[in-house]
């Protein structure tokens, strides 16, 4: 699956907000967005009034960049969400929250989703005792996610746990840091994903045009 490999900090500057794509660095004075809080490029400082379409497009781009998903897969998530019963906004959020790389990040085994994706790609993550190397794998309620025993001493995992062990876990997850495992208990409600700075309704309106 293709993925974005360019500078992460430029994405935050383009969206005009911190997306926390680099973990701990985003909270330090090394954060590029804090030093240059304007879009990259020669005209980055220019203030532009967005049209309704522009607002919708920015919402979509922001959500894609937060979860590290490119357009083809993100549209597929929308199409799946729109076919399901219930609130399409919540269905879309559930689709991206169920990604294995996202769940590894949410459990606190990685400082950001990029590192979580690498952990999955490199075979460090088990789902229900079996190795899964597909970051977009859709985790289901009741699935147990753990770090392989041979991988528990690698620095990114140990640093992430040290950073996250005293933080509250999202309410749809439970985590056991002593045993390097966690459980995806249920799908999240839209209002529970409090760190998503996106108007999801704008994305739905964009795709349904």
UniProtKB/Swiss-Prot annotation:
One of the Pfam families matching this protein, by short name: Ribosomal_S4
Residue span(s) of domain S4 RNA-binding: 98-164
Recorded GO MF terms: rRNA binding; structural constituent of ribosome
Any Gene Ontology CC annotation: small ribosomal subunit
One BP annotation, GO: ribosomal small subunit biogenesis
InterPro entries on file: Ribosomal_uS4 (IPR022801), Ribosomal_uS4_bac-type (IPR005709), Ribosomal_uS4_N (IPR001912), S4_RNA-bd (IPR002942), S4_RNA-bd_sf (IPR036986)
Keywords for this protein: Ribonucleoprotein, Ribosomal protein, RNA-binding, rRNA-binding
Role this protein plays: One of the primary rRNA binding proteins, it binds directly to 16S rRNA where it nucleates assembly of the body of the 30S subunit. With S5 and S12 plays an important role in translational accuracy.
Family listed: Belongs to the universal ribosomal protein uS4 family.
PANTHER family recorded: 30S 40S RIBOSOMAL PROTEIN (PTHR11831), SMALL RIBOSOMAL SUBUNIT PROTEIN US4M (PTHR11831:SF4)
Subunit structure: Part of the 30S ribosomal subunit. Contacts protein S5. The interaction surface between S4 and S5 is involved in control of translational fidelity.
Protein's UniProt name: Small ribosomal subunit protein uS4
Native organism taxonomy: Bacteria, Thermotogati, Thermotogota, Thermotogae, Thermotogales
């Amino acid at each position: 699956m293709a993925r974005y490999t360019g500078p992460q900090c430029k994405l935050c500057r383009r969206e005009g907000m911190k997306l926390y794509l680099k973990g701990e660095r985003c909270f330090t004075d090394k954060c590029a967005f804090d030093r240059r809080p304007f879009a990259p490029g020669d005209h980055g400082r220019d203030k532009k009034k967005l049209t309704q379409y522009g607002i919708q497009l920015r919402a979509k781009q922001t959500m894609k960049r937060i979860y590290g998903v490119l357009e083809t897969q993100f549209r597929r998530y929308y199409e799946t969400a729109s076919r399901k019963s219930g609130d399409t906004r919540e269905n879309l959020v559930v689709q991206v929250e169920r990604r294995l790389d996202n769940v590894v990040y949410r459990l606190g085994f990685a400082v950001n989703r990029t590192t979580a994706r690498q952990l999955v790609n490199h075979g460090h993550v088990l789902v229900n005792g079996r190795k899964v190397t597909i970051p977009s794998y859709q985790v289901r309620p009741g699935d147990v996610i753990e770090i392989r025993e041979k991988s528990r001493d690698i620095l990114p995992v140990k640093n992430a746990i040290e950073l996250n062990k005293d933080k509250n876990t999202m309410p749809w997850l439970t985590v056991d840091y002593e045993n390097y495992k966690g459980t995806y208990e249920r799908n999240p409600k839209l209002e529970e994903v409090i760190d998503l700075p996106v108007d999801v309704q704008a994305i739905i309106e964009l795709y349904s045009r």
